[in-house]
Every structure is written in C-alpha cells, then in structure tokens.
Regions:
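Hydrophobic packing within well-folded, soluble alpha/beta domains
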Residues: 77, 90-94, 106, 121, ...
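Short hydrophobic/aromatic beta-strand or adjacent loop that forms the aromatic wall/cage
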Residues: 42, 149-156
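Acetyl-CoA-dependent GNAT
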Residues: 3-5, 9-80, 91-93, 97, ...
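Short glycine/proline-centered loop/turn elements that form peptide/ligand docking sites
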Residues: 87, 91, 113-117, 133-140
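Conserved catalytic-core motifs of GNAT/GCN5-like acyltransferases
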Residues: 109-110, 122, 127-147, 154
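Conserved GNAT acetyl-CoA-binding A-motif
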Residues: 98-109
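Conserved acyl-donor/pantetheine-binding loop and adjacent beta-alpha core of acyl/acetyltransferases
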Residues: 56-69, 134-149
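Active-site acidic-Proline motif in GNAT/NAT acetyltransferases
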Residues: 78-80, 84, 112-113
Length: 161
C-alpha cells in the first residue's frame, strides 16, 4: 500500500530528508529556500509520501514578470514520481497558502518549452497573461557538473476565490 500524499510548509528539521530524497548538488537549494523562508521572502512547500519528500515548490511573495500576484516557482517533481498528482497537490496547497494571506490570485511562471507543465496549469484553470520574462541561472547535477540555463518564461495566473 502506498503512503498518503501530504503537502506542507517546509521546516528546518526537514533539511536532511530533503537533501537525501531530492538532492540539489552544490546548489544547496533546500537550505537557501529555508533561509529565504525565515526572512519572509518565500514559503517553501514540500510534498511527502510517508516520510519521503516527493516534490517541492516555492511561493515567492513578490511576483516576477509584472504579476501583481505572488508566484509559485521552482515546482519540481522527479520523473519517477511524475503523473501521480504530486504537482497538482503542490499547486493547490500554494493556492491555499496565498488565500490564507489574503491574496487575490496566484501566478505561475512556466518555461515556454515546458509544454507538459503548462498543460497541467491550464487544466487547473490558470490563464496565460501574455506577460513574458527571461531568466538565467546555474545549477549543478548530482555529479557536480555545472549547467548554465536560460528560461523564456510565460506567466499564467489564477484568480483565487
């Protein structure tokens, strides 16, 4: 029997499980997002199946790309557990977090090449705003190899009721 899926706000005590279950290499992303959460800039969300992390997302309280809404970003579900409702659960939890702070909507930025993620967001009711932005970043794979990426992001939003 598969353990139930839950999503909650990350805590500092989750760091060892996150590093083991969803390694980020030299980026140390989990620690960085927890620090930004402590500073009030973001809310770091983690999906769990039992005691194993199976996905993450970040609610940035200042939207990018001209959005007046907070933005769900860095949504990641590893390929072996995709198509199991994890991404959807993280999105819905992010919406609840935004609502609990009195926000009227939520934005999601999606790389123009990520057709699968865009289809998910659109199925969930998110609408393309026509706003675009470009961002570059560096990440490290599990072997420590450096990768430079540039994303061309389109902004989708959902008004929260």
């Amino acid at each position: 029997m598969t353990a139930a899926l839950t999503v909650r706000v990350a805590e500092d005590a989750d760091l060892p499980a996150l590093d083991r279950g969803l390694p980020t290499g030299r980026n140390d992303a989990h620690r960085a997002f927890l620090a930004r959460q402590a500073a009030g800039e973001v809310t770091y969300l983690v999906a769990w199946r039992g005691d194993a992390p199976v996905g993450v997302g970040v609610v940035r309280w200042t939207g990018r790309g001209g959005s007046p809404y907070p933005e769900l970003s860095n949504l990641h579900v590893p390929p072996p557990v995709q198509s199991q409702g994890i991404g959807t659960a993280i999105v819905h939890f992010a919406e609840d977090v935004a609502r609990s702070r009195g926000r009227a909507g939520l934005a999601i930025g999606v790389d123009e090449d990520n057709v699968r993620a865009a289809a998910l967001y659109e199925r969930l009711g998110y609408v393309d705003t026509g706003r675009r932005w470009t961002g570059s970043y560096t990440w490290y794979d599990e072997s420590g190899a450096e990768h430079a990426e540039t994303e061309h992001v389109r902004v989708l939003t959902l008004k929260l009721g």
